[in-house]
Amino acid sequence: ILRCLVGSEMCIRDRAMTIYRQYAIGPSSFFLRAESFFTLATQAREYSRGYGDMSRLHEMSHGEGFLEILLSHTGKGLYLMDEPESALSTQRQLTLLEHMYRMANDGSQFIIATHSPILLGLPDAEILSFDENGVHPCDYEDTDSYQITRVFINHRESLLRHLLGNEM
């Protein structure tokens, strides 16, 4: 149902993002990155391109507005997301996960590049790891995001002592 792309090797990412075939773009399609949210909010307000009521995006926090755009899209389709967690709090990542799960069950597909252990935890996700061994399937518990988060939560004091030494 879902493919999550993880990793940060530039050469692998460049190859993964190469467009081999151009597809028709629907009237409500757009490219959304957390970094370009302000520009999109301005365009949505000015052109009212079928985004629903987006007139208040500039009045919202960055994360709330970003989530509003994501939640306003409910139609079946293929959704490509590049690190959507970068604009979202932990709680709002859970909101996005719930939304994606419902949409996937209704026939939508997602391809997501993420480092979020929350988004990687989506039930039935097919997780692909991009690392020095190439691209390969990876179990949730074997992702760096999950393992590092687990170590931090379970062993925070000792990890901080190791990282910060006498500075603590």
Please describe what each predicted stretch is:
Residues 15-25, 52-54, 90, 95-104:
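Catalytic phosphate/metal-binding cores of nucleic-acid and nucleotide-processing enzymes, i.e., regions
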Residues 1-7, 11-12:
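Single conserved hydrophobic/aromatic residue that forms the stacking wall/gate
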Residues 91-112, 116-168:
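C-terminal lobe/lid and adjacent interdomain/linker elements of RecA-like ASCE P-loop ATPase modules
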Residues 3-4, 72, 121:
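Solvent-exposed polar/charged
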Residues 29-95:
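Conserved ABC ATPase signature
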Residues 13-31, 153-157, 161-164, 168:
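Extended, highly charged alpha-helical segments
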Residues 10-11, 33, 113:
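Hydrophobic beta-strand positions within the nucleotide-binding domains of ABC ATPases
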Residues 28, 75-78, 104-111:
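Loop/turn-to-beta-strand initiation segments
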